[in-house]
């Protein structure tokens, strides 16, 4: 494919336009009085969302160079979301300011390399100062962090605090859509472990990069599966029943994995493969725990059991299974209480008999996973559009709460960044030239989130920042009052603030040191009637896998 090249100020100018287009769409959502963004969908009703990363993923700009700038800022939002679960809009607002100021100074003759060094030194100091300022989470702080992250919704804050209280900080909390209008908290049997899908092609929700099935069957085995022939009987059974299948095995690889992926993508099967947790004998124990939890049978080599002879009664059942790239959560049905109690009692007897501290730790972990249960927040709303928006808010609030538990809390509303910016004056005095300018860029950038929160609430951002410095108090955008935000319960998770700042400066420093941009040359519009050719042609490439196992000849006419 032919490429387009852009150089120097022209290239940086195009990148900046892309950054501004995306950032301007995102920053209207920040703060308790942030606005919504309406996103048109090809099919169905439009989405109305308040979630930064969801908005960012929907934006594609016509100009290829501007689109690269937009995608770099989308990367800021996505990285912050992935690592902290919240703070995407804060990261975007910071990155936009840093890019604008950095490019303005570069155009005036500043060295982009020296600017970057100064910016990185400033951020390193802010991160150190942030750690010193953080306070551990206690009392009502959990509810307050969740409430702030949910856009001031106290019902959500209370529900998340209640969920953590019931399943502990280390417990599993999931969010699902309710069939009623009410949002409810349900505690049920379940388990989570740190293994994800065997292939990203099993993803069913591309926005969240997860694979999620309702009421799936679960094949549980300690075997390594490489031949599709081993799976044909069970695949035929679940295909006839229309039931999703989760294959939990030591490894699914080669021909078996490729065939499952192709049939899943063609819509023939609802299937996903997951690597079994732990190693060696502990893996068998963990799989045994999952078998008891789901009412299934562990198909084990030790018992001389064969995958070809698996019956539907050997498969485990779950209410819901959610799989990410590195974790799996099983929400169990409620029919296994007796077997579960017996399993826990058996593990406790093992615990009493062992003297090894390591074994005791692992056995206690197994008990906690089986006994702790899963807190399920069932989200209800009058319309599907509101339901999606509310679900995103709850997920953000839950992620922010977990981040607060990890690294502590600070005053919210952008106030902490504003306070920490004052400490950069001493650092700037120690530096000179463009490095000093880089520090000053970060100092000014740290005021940007507070300004935008104030603007979204209908106030003058510059006046609010000036008043905060003069009064020594934070700005409560919900009430329009100046007060101690820690006492008022307006809190941010330190981890969210730290990652937003680090991710923002990472992308901004790359952008201001860019000299050449290379983009794909847009293809001319297709002739009328030819539009369907390319997509179908691309699918045809998968047909080459049809010889992989010859499933049609093995009793699976509907597959491959």
UniProtKB/Swiss-Prot annotation:
Signal peptide coordinates: none
Keyword Nucleotide-binding assigned: yes
Regions of compositional bias (Gly residues) in chain numbering: 530-542
Residues reported in the UniProt entry to bind ATP: 29-32, 86-90, 413, 492
UniProt xrefs under Gene3D superfamilies: GroEL, GroEL-like equatorial domain, TCP-1-like chaperonin intermediate domain
Record EC number: 5.6.1.7
Entry's localization field: Cytoplasm
Keyword match Cytoplasm: yes
Stored InterPro entries: Chaperonin_Cpn60_CS, Cpn60/GroEL, Cpn60/GroEL/TCP-1, GroEL-like_apical_dom_sf, GROEL-like_equatorial_sf, TCP-1-like_intermed_sf
Catalytic reactions of this protein: ATP + H2O + a folded polypeptide = ADP + phosphate + an unfolded polypeptide
Main subcellular localisation: cytoplasm
GO biological process, one term: protein refolding
Pfam families for the chain: Cpn60_TCP1 (PF00118)
Cellular component terms (Gene Ontology): cytoplasm
Region (Disordered): 520-542
NCBIfam families reported for this sequence: GroEL, PRK00013.1, PRK12849.1, PRK12850.1, PRK12851.1
Role summary: Together with its co-chaperonin GroES, plays an essential role in assisting protein folding. The GroEL-GroES system forms a nano-cage that allows encapsulation of the non-native substrate proteins and provides a physical environment optimized to promote and accelerate protein folding.
Similarity annotation: Belongs to the chaperonin (HSP60) family.
Name of the protein: Chaperonin GroEL 2
Lineage: Bacteria, Bacillati, Cyanobacteriota, Cyanophyceae, Synechococcales
